[in-house]
């Protein structure tokens, strides 16, 4: 596959930013069966403290998609949680509006909802599920891998550190999240809450993306993911939601396998 490293100025972020893309191996080949059709697209989001190169450097993603006609878009979300923060950058609008428009024009991406998927791990899992539920008209399906369900709370981070997982200083993480989400006591009723968005989407008319939650059985974020899955089961009967627990921790060994489960869920061919 072709790997593209793109630097661009974002009007929503008001700064330069970066994107890594995987382009199909068969692009432009005379005997390809696509004959000018636009490409399906998978937006793939990284976690807190990572960047747009993490999926490509630390998993076998390119190998899995070697013979698939799909474009993978991996934006640099920095530590912005893929939302328009209270006192931070507009990563939500950048992800769901500016980026699809710009890349669609440059890389012949399909604008159709049924060809558009989004996934991510940890902070990116939160961003993927939130984007799909906040903009159900844009995405056919979304997958959250080891989703950081409550990004306003730091309760799971000390336990993660005890297991040897690399995390930034807790004070810095807490300061960053409060700039984005505001006071903790306002979170559950805010537009940042996955539960609030799920309930809103469940009660709304119109398209509803299929949702997948994956988590490792030794992940410190498992209790929060189980709680979110129970909420879907108890309060969102109109949503197509799947929750699956597999062996693994909060690391790329697990996410390397989990992304294949997500690709199968999306109906995207892979090895």
PLM regions: where:
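Non-catalytic cap/lid and distal C-terminal segments of serine-dependent acyl enzymes
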Residues: 1-271
């Amino acid at each position: 596959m072709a790997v593209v490293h793109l630097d661009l100025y974002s009007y929503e972020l008001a700064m330069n930013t970066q994107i890594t893309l995987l382009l199909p191996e068969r692009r432009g080949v005379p005997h390809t069966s696509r004959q000018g059709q636009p490409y399906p697209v998978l937006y793939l989001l990284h976690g807190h403290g990572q960047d747009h190169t993490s999926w490509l450097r630390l998993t076998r993603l390119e190998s899995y998609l070697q013979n698939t006609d799909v474009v993978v878009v991996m934006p640099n979300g920095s530590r912005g949680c893929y939302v328009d923060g209270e006192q931070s950058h507009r990563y939500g609008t950048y992800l769901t509006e500016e980026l699809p428009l710009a890349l669609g024009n440059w890389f012949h991406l399909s604008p159709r909802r049924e060809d558009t998927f989004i996934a991510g791990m940890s902070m990116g899992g939160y961003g993927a599920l939130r984007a799909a539920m906040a903009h159900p008209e844009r995405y056919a399906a979304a997958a959250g891998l080891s989703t950081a369900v409550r990004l306003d709370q730091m309760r799971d981070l000390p336990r993660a550190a005890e297991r040897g997982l690399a995390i930034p200083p807790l004070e810095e993480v807490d300061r960053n999240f409060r700039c984005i989400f505001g006071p903790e006591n306002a979170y559950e009723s805010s537009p940042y809450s996955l539960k609030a968005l799920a309930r809103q989407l469940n009660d709304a008319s119109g398209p509803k993306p299929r949702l997948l939650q994956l988590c490792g059985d030794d992940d410190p974020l498992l209790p929060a993911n189980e709680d979110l899955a129970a909420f879907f089961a108890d309060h969102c009967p109109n949503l197509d939601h799947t929750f699956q627990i597999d062996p693994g921790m909060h690391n790329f060994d697990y996410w390397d396998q989990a992304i294949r489960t997500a690709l199968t869920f999306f109906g995207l061919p892979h090895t």
